[in-house]
Amino acid sequence: MPIQEALESLRSGKPVLVFDSKDREGETDIVFASQFITPNAIRLMRKDGGGLICVTMPSKVADILGLDYLIKIYERSRMPFVKRLYPNDIPYGEQSSFSITINHRKTFTGIPDADRALTISKFAEIVEHALSSNSEYKKAQVVSEFGRNFRTPGHVFTLIASKGLISRRKGHTELTTYLAYLAGLIPSTTIVEMLGDDGKSLSKSKAIEYAKKRGFVFLEGKDIIKKFLSEPLPNI
């Protein structure tokens, strides 16, 4: 079963490819479990993917850390440009999952492979600590840890998965965060869109061809959604 093969790949620190839907973005993302990100993984993502390297988090973690969707942060700023640039015309009809950008404080510029790998792997630890915090005191400790170790703006884009995951939104953020949950890993993935040499997103057929050539699992969003409907996760 492709789902099980994908979970094994994620547990082993290997990437999987996820195509959302022809009726949505129609894009394939390279996906790693954030806890296993290495400089080599970042190199593969930027060279074979080419899109924007982002790290996901469950909405519960965002709530604990006091993070919000970037558009909500802009709205609260009440700066005039926000109204003029409001994203009310996204072609695939969904709110963006983007939140703030971050760098780990031990990075230099934050952009080299090693810097981004450090930022992402350490952020995965924050996600784990936040989800295991079972008191207000422990939550406050995680918030303090986040502030001590990270700064913004940075070179890693964070994404907040919708509450209820796929039941609310069917983007790569939700699809892949759910896969990490299923794999029993820290529920944070690192994702990047695959781009072609024609100035467009890499076609599905070429993404499948790439997966076969590299021995990577290729998953379709519809298969992940089907799994979610039969095995939803509580309290997410």
Segment roles from a protein language model:
Residues 1-236:
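Catalytic domains of riboflavin
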